[in-house]
């Protein structure tokens, strides 16, 4: 069993640890955020649909060899150890041990892919893995904001369940400072469009992204975006906000700002105080707050 075209992207949310990882686009279409080291030096490109479908077929074949959902752990381990299955099977094994229910589409902005192409991918997913009940992906706010509402609805109808959007900050000043390539208005539009299409929405917020210099603006702007988007979420599927505390990765432009004295990292106490201020500013607007990353 050979899989010459098989690819897997470098990252996924912690909540997708046992998800089937399907790479539909390589790297990041923006790739300029000053805090992110992940795709630096890598060019973004879209994968051809036949390549993606071949990956799905290969993963389904590996799942059959491993015994499928509910297969014997002993037999699965033996197959992985004796080399009778290809490297793709290691990732498939995690998916199966998690119940074979969740899929994550990679890399940073699959929403930049044509909607009909994504629909074709999800159709093949459902054919090959009928136990799937959740398909999620990352998306850039600027991309989602430009998408037609009917395109987002077609993705939801085809099986896309949840959109992970990098809010980071709701302050235009902070967003410009970190070269995010999105505005607060685009974040609001993207969030509301996703919810109106029937998608679950997860926003990522980065405590400390404004540094000491712009902490107040960061809190105020982020609270405004959350207050504008959260009420649009249905009660049974509230907006989820996941925290990703700002860290300085070597080789990023943010490192240079810190070294030059233009950006001062918050300490732990200041970070906690900023988060408290954010929650106070959001008020009684309903949303779920989750802290599920080692950076926190």
Predicted features, each with a name:
Residues 28, 36, 52, 105, ...:
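Conserved, mostly hydrophobic/aromatic
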Residues 1-21:
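Short, charged low-complexity linear segments at domain edges
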Residues 253-262:
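Short, glycine-/aromatic-enriched active-site segment of Class I SAM-dependent methyltransferases
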Residues 294-296:
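Conserved catalytic loop of SAM-dependent methyltransferase domains
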Residues 44-47, 51, 113, 117, ...:
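Alpha-helix N-cap and loop-to-helix initiation/capping positions
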Residues 14-75:
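Canonical Radical SAM [4Fe-4S] cluster-binding loop centered on the CxxxCxxC motif
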Residues 162, 185-254, 268-292:
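Conserved C-terminal portion of the radical SAM core fold
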Residues 61-196, 284:
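Conserved SAM/AdoMet-binding glycine-rich loop
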């Amino acid at each position: 069993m050979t899989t010459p075209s098989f690819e897997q992207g470098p990252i996924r949310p912690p909540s997708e640890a046992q998800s089937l990882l399907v790479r539909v686009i390589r790297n990041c279409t923006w790739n300029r955020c000053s805090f992110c080291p992940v795709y630096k030096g890598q060019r973004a490109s879209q994968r051809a649909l036949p390549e993606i479908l071949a990956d799905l077929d290969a993963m389904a074949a590996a799942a059959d060899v491993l015994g499928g959902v509910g297969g014997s752990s002993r037999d699965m381990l033996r197959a992985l150890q004796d080399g009778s299955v290809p490297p793709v099977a290691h990732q498939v094994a995690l998916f199966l041990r998690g119940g074979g229910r969740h899929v994550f589409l990679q890399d940073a902005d699959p929403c930049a892919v044509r909607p009909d192409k994504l629909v074709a991918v999800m159709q093949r997913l459902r054919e090959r893995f009928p136990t799937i009940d959740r398909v999620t992906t990352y998306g850039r706010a600027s991309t989602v904001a430009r998408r037609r509402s009917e395109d987002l609805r077609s993705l939801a109808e085809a099986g896309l369940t949840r959109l992970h959007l990098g809010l980071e900050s709701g302050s235009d000043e902070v967003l410009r400072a970190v070269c995010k390539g999105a505005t607060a208005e685009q974040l609001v539009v993207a969030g509301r469009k996703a919810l109106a299409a029937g998608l679950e929405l997860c926003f990522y917020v980065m405590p400390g992204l404004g540094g000491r210099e712009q902490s107040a603006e960061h809190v105020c702007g982020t609270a405004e975006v959350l207050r504008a988007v959260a009420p649009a979420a249905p009660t049974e599927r509230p907006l989820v906000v996941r925290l990703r505390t700002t860290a300085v990765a070597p080789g990023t432009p943010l490192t240079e700002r810190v070294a030059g004295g233009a950006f001062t990292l918050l300490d732990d106490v200041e970070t906690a105080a900023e988060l408290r201020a954010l929650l106070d500013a959001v008020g009684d607007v309903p949303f779920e707050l989750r802290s599920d990353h080692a950076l926190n």
